[in-house]
């Protein structure tokens, strides 16, 4: 899947964010991007902070190991996760 890459001990994700959702969840693939719904509104960086917190739980890493490289102000983002301890099921299937 083009929106998911492993490079050494890093995982790179192209994500599409749906803010103000009813619950936090990975919804599946949205074209070449992983669609993630989060409950935070897209105001004053709240959605980005919430996305990092959500991804940290999914990958079992510290929040400091997740960096938004592109798209801080938009719904389309590129995220780097360093040394993930686990992969969410949808990505584990894509890695095969």
From Swiss-Prot:
Q: Which residues form a coiled coil?
A: none
Show the GO cellular component annotation of the record. Answer: cytoplasm
Read off the Pfam families from this record.
DUF167
May I ask which residue range the UniProt record assigns to the signal sequence?
Answer: none
Transmembrane spans? none
Family the UniProt entry places it in? Belongs to the UPF0235 family.
PANTHER family for this protein = UPF0235 PROTEIN C15ORF40 (PTHR13420:SF7)
Put simply, this protein is called UPF0235 protein Tola_0962
Q: Which organism is it from?
A: Tolumonas auensis (strain DSM 9187 / NBRC 110442 / TA 4)
């Amino acid at each position: 899947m083009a929106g998911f890459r492993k490079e050494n001990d890093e995982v790179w994700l192209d994500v599409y964010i749906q803010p103000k959702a009813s619950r936090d969840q990975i919804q599946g693939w949205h074209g070449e991007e992983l669609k993630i719904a989060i409950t935070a509104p897209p105001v004053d960086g709240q959605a980005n902070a919430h996305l990092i917190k959500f991804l940290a739980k999914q990958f079992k890493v510290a929040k400091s190991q997740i960096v938004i490289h592109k798209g801080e102000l938009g719904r389309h983002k590129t995220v780097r996760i360093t040394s993930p301890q686990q992969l969410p099921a949808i990505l584990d299937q894509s890695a095969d």
